[in-house]
C-alpha cells in the first residue's frame, strides 16, 4: 500500500485555484444531456466521479468533446429523455453523484438499464429514491439487496402526480427526483417526508435547473411543484464553480497555520452551501475575508465550537481535524448522513482521531472531540475515502507530522490535492 509522509509544517501561505465542484459538474452534465442544444461546460472537475458519469453518457449515445486537460466539455444535448434499443449495463464505481441522478433519469425514456458499482456502492442506500420513482410508475428491480444497488430499470417513462420522498437520509434522492420531474408526462408535486438534510445542496440543484430554463416552486423545502410541459434548454455556457468542500482544507490550513491562504473559484456569490464552512472557522477565531469569487483565511488561536453542521456535511469533516488545534471540546451535531457516504465517516473519523491521542465521543449523529495535550504521530487509514485523506492532511501542522495511507484515494475529487497542499508551505 502506498503511503505519504507529511513532515511538520511551520507556516502556510499562498493562493489556490479550487478545481470544479463535483456536485455541480455531474448535475450540469446530466442537465446538458437532457437539454435542447449544445452546452459548453468550463472548469469541469477532472476526477473519478466525473469520469464515471462521462463514460456512462457516452455508452448511452451522448456526444461530447473534452479538452486535453478534461476541464472543458462541449456536449450535444438529446433534447429530451435517454432511450436505448439494446440493454445497457453501466458501471458507476462509488460515484453517488452519478448513481442517484442517472437512476432517476433513465426511468424517463425507453429501454433496459442495469446500474452497478464498486462493493461500497452496494452498501450505499438508494431505496428512498426508488420508492419515489415507483410512485410515478417506474419499474426498478434490485439485483441483490432491497434498497441498494445494483439494480435494473425497465424504462417506459414517468407519469405525473403526487409523490412522497424521504428527506432525512440524503438530499441526493430529492435532487435526482427534482431533475427528472420536468420530463414526466404530467405535473409533479413532491412532498418531503421528515426534516430535509443538506438543504444547500437542493439550492444548487434548483439554481442549475433554472439556468437550463426550468422553474420549480419551492414551498419551504417541504413541497416542490414542477409544472408539466417544461423543457431543459441549454444556456450555451456553464461555468462550474470551484468545489467549496475542497476549499475547506486550504481555509482550515490558513486558520491553523497562517500566514494567509486565499482560495479562488468560490466566494460570497457561490451557490454552494459549503462556503459557510468559512463562517464556522470565523466562529472558532480565524480571520476571514470574503470576495465575490474568493475567500481568505488568516491564522489565530482557535477555540472550540458546538454547532449543528447538517447544512455543510462534507466540509464539517474538516472541522473535526481542525478541532485538534482548538482550545476546548468541539461538538459537530446532526451529521448522521456521514454514515452513508464513501465510508461510515463517523466511525472512521472517531477511530483515526483516537490514533493521534484525541478523546472522542462518537454518537449516532454527532462527534465530540477533545484535543490531546500533545498530538501523536500515526498512520492514518483513509477507507478509500477522498475526504478522510484530505482532512487528515491538517495533522501536518502538529509537531510530529503524520503518515497518510493510500493518499491516491483523493482522485475521486482532487487528484493533485497533496501537490497543491505542499505548494502552500514555506
Swiss-Prot record:
Q: What is its EC number?
A: 2.5.1.19
Give the GO cellular component terms, alphabetically. Answer: cytoplasm
Does the record bear Amino-acid biosynthesis in its keywords? yes
Listed binding positions for phosphoenolpyruvate are 22, 96, 124, 172, 345, 387, 412
Identify the metabolic or biological route this protein is part of. Metabolic intermediate biosynthesis; chorismate biosynthesis; chorismate from D-erythrose 4-phosphate and phosphoenolpyruvate: step 6/7
Where does the protein principally reside?
A: cytoplasm
Active site residues according to the UniProt entry: 314
Which domain of life does the protein's organism represent? Answer: Bacteria
Supply the PANTHER family for this chain: AROM/DEHYDROQUINATE SYNTHASE, PENTAFUNCTIONAL AROM POLYPEPTIDE
Assembly and partners are described as: Monomer.
Q: What does the protein in this record do?
A: Catalyzes the transfer of the enolpyruvyl moiety of phosphoenolpyruvate (PEP) to the 5-hydroxyl of shikimate-3-phosphate (S3P) to produce enolpyruvyl shikimate-3-phosphate and inorganic phosphate.
What is the name attached to this protein's record? 3-phosphoshikimate 1-carboxyvinyltransferase
- Write down the species: Shewanella baltica (strain OS155 / ATCC BAA-1091)
